[in-house]
Amino acid sequence: LRITDGGFPAGTHRALRGYRIRITARYRYAFFLSSFLPFLLSVFLLSSPTLAQPTKAFKQAIPPYTFQFPQDHASHPAYQTEWWYYTGHLQSNDRIFGYELTFFRVGINPNPQPGGSRWRMHTLYFAHFALTDEDGEQFFHKEEISRPALDMAGARENRFQVWINDWSAELADSAAHRIRASADFASIALDLVPAKPPVIHGHDGVSQKSPGVGRASHYYSLTRLQTTGTLTFEGETFEVTGLSWMDHEFGSNQLTDDQKGWDWFSLQLDNNRELMLYVMRRKDGTYEPTSSGTMIYTDGTWRHLSLEMFEIEATGAWTSPHSGGTYPHAWRIAVPSEQIELRLTPTVSDQELGKNSLIGVIYWEGSVVVRGTDQGRPVTGQGYVELTGYKGRVPGL
């Protein structure tokens, strides 16, 4: 099954009459599951007694967990949700672009049975490709959805390779991450070489998202990936270089009903340091105490940051002409113990996603420029920011 830009297999149009699918971009914690998955199941899932009465549950992210690389780049189907997420900034002469390519694996049945129809669905795959033309102030995005039947989508357990149709990410023999995607607005063919080892977020291999056992993920990042390749855009092919960031998370049952959304930041400074921060926002307007971050140093070592160790202040706002949602649109970020004071500004105002989506989840995610001071010295940089729950509450995972 392939669903993209309104295309459906024969026989499903009657069930979907009145809807137009243009599901786009990335959903950091696969928050669309609670609203969209029942629909997918009702339309596509072949009935099975095993699905109705599972004999085991999906595995939860519980400490301690020791990452093993390169094995942990690969798929972890014992967990319900998993995503591989790439963002970066590409340059060719005077042109600058931001890009995003993300793959999701969503487990539906923790007890898949051997045999039966090849179309029986125990896993769904989603992929999102987005491009920000920073000079032209344009933003484009597309999503692919598929099941693993006939190898239309998949993620290997023995080595890192994930794909949907002709979109893919894999670990090459050279240890470079090789990513490929194409859409009507652009295509990319990039090789990403880590300049630093993987950074493990949280404590004991677990990044806690909300209180309670298992309400967490196993989460690591490659925070500085030297990037080369080609970008085809508006009929022209650019040889590009740049920096990318890769996240990989897997877990089950992470969020609570009390959480409305989150703000997430990945920042790459030009002094060879990086910063990741996220805050989970509750319905009463406060931050979840488990919100945290990670400071990454020039030598690849890192330091965990608890919520009280950093400050995030919105200094501007932007109201979407599409959804009417109002988002923070500029930020001051401080990490006093690291002597970091930063200002973030979006490269393009309108980087809102999901405005024509069937699932009805609307959020903002896009590239930002960074200016400020680090240890008393001027610093610049680049990053990506994700904002959810500002136009309606985000369903939980």
Language model features with spans:
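Short, basic, low-complexity termini and linkers enriched in Ser/Thr/Gly/Pro
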Residues: L1-F8, R14, Y19-T24, A30-P49
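Intrinsic disorder/low-complexity signal
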Residues: T4, P9-A10, R17, S349, ...
